[in-house]
Amino acid sequence: MAEQFVYQVARIRSLELQLFSDQTVEQLIAVQTYDDAIRFLQEKGWGTGQENDADAILDRENEKIWALVKELNIEGKYFDVLSLPKQYHNLKAAVKESIVGEVDFPLYYEDTEPSGSKIKELVRDKEYDKLPEGMRKAAREAVESLLHTGDGQLCDIIIDRACLEAVEKAGKKAGSSVIRDYAESTVAVADIKTAVRAQKTGKSVDFIKRALAECETLDIQRLAKAAFAGAEELRSYLSETVYSDGANALAQSPSAFERWCDNRIIRTIKPQKYESFTIGPVVAYVIARLNEIKTVRIILSGKLNGLTDESIRERVREMYV
């Protein structure tokens, strides 16, 4: 019998009432200034009420998410798909620092297992076998690649692909349909983003194939060939897949495409609003909160940089509730 999470879901249902709706986001966009936006967030209970800095408020909201997960006493395996990108960020930083010294990675995430400082130590000492299994091969390849070619971009794609492969594997292993679907969407959307960037920068088909991670909803061989062939061919291939809406967004603008990518993932988790017993609603809530924070960051950045409301509106993400 599948594990049930009746108490945890009941708690999440009460917290969902505090999530920003599309209407709340519109109200935030409508405030006049950046300072007004900060006050709006504080009135909604964001931060501790003491911060006047956007980064401090958003960091505090992120901390609240993981404090809640800890409070609900849920196994970490259910959130691997969300924590893996932080782990591989740490690996990327550690590899570059081990070869070229201080790099533009001012932050190692320490709230991961293993921690950022531990990954840094293992890579520095070339103790790759002590890294998590999915990292070992990527760490070796990335170090060797950077050492012999000095190509930081090649180092990045080796680690980014390994991260996506780990996300796909974790999604299947978690035993939850929402986590599996989220992982699949995450990998596919990342592959599409990679293909789009590669097409725009004229990368070779071999480079594109090396950068893409296998997933069930895309044929990455066809995706790579389409990206190499050109923008029209790439949109044509996507129009044949479950990501056909992405082809339309891609034709509109880069910001429309980025927005579509995030909205696609939110739509994947929306059915969890009607689940009552599985881990799904808890995971969906965490994803929804992360999306909410990202959207607020976009709005605050727009206010700070004097963008029009319409320009900000084009960039905001769809909300979960």
How would you label these PLM feature ranges?
Residues 1-321:
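N-terminal domain-start signal
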